[in-house]
């Protein structure tokens, strides 16, 4: 199997062309490939498939290192877009793809930056999914060690965002797993911890479901900014600093799609026997 190793701000991926190759990924194969000591090593496996809809260019599949399939990965989407252009699978710079839960528009820029139309944030609890009677800007979520005030949103995958005073000393190693598997999230959740610098600048760390804390989480950055705007503490254009680097997020509010812009880096190509 031919593959490419890529990363978006340190969030690393193996990207596989399933348009010109016949590939199949059982859970045990994904886990073996994800092993950083005995396999290739990655946060997520991204698979480029032929479009399910003739009006689209590709279908985009995402698997976590534990073998679970998820419906969204913003950093992965940027790498996906660069991959299909680099490999000559398309000559378009505006690429339309489907995911397990919707559609995305990806725009490859000349400076290796990619802008992703992430769609409109989803706030209805039953669509996230999140166990709550109605939408609220802030939810009280109780864990074994702490009661938290959180914003909850879906960017195609569920996110729980908590504001912290100091991102470096936030108790993410403990709170991340507790939120990820909290009973109010039937499909588990990505837990984001946001420090607000000013109305146009935040720092963020994300504990991703199925992957743990990563260097960067694109959909997590989108979720944090959307929550901050909804809560009235952020403006419409926000710089997000993650451990792996910087993303720019723009959202004009309800009724509008959210845009994420950031780097997508190709590291190397390889061949492995499955």
Swiss-Prot record:
Keyword Amino-acid biosynthesis found: yes
Cellular location(s): Cytoplasm
Gene Ontology molecular function: diaminopimelate epimerase activity
Could be important to modulate the pK values of the two catalytic cysteine residues (site feature) positions: 159, 208
Entry GO CC: cytosol
Pathway annotation from the record: Amino-acid biosynthesis; L-lysine biosynthesis via DAP pathway; DL-2,6-diaminopimelate from LL-2,6-diaminopimelate: step 1/1
Protein keywords: Amino-acid biosynthesis, Cytoplasm, Isomerase, Lysine biosynthesis
Record EC number: 5.1.1.7
Binding site for substrate: 11, 44, 64, 74-75, 157, 190, 208-209, 218-219
Xref: SUPFAM superfamilies: Diaminopimelate epimerase-like
UniProt catalytic activity: (2S,6S)-2,6-diaminopimelate = meso-2,6-diaminopimelate
Site feature Important for dimerization, where: 268
Residues at the catalytic site: 73, 217
GO biological process: lysine biosynthetic process via diaminopimelate
Pfam family, one: DAP_epimerase
Subcellular location, principal: cytoplasm
UniProt key word Cytoplasm: yes
Assigned protein family: Belongs to the diaminopimelate epimerase family.
Function: Catalyzes the stereoinversion of LL-2,6-diaminopimelate (L,L-DAP) to meso-diaminopimelate (meso-DAP), a precursor of L-lysine and an essential component of the bacterial peptidoglycan.
Subunit structure: Homodimer.
The name this protein goes by in its record: Diaminopimelate epimerase
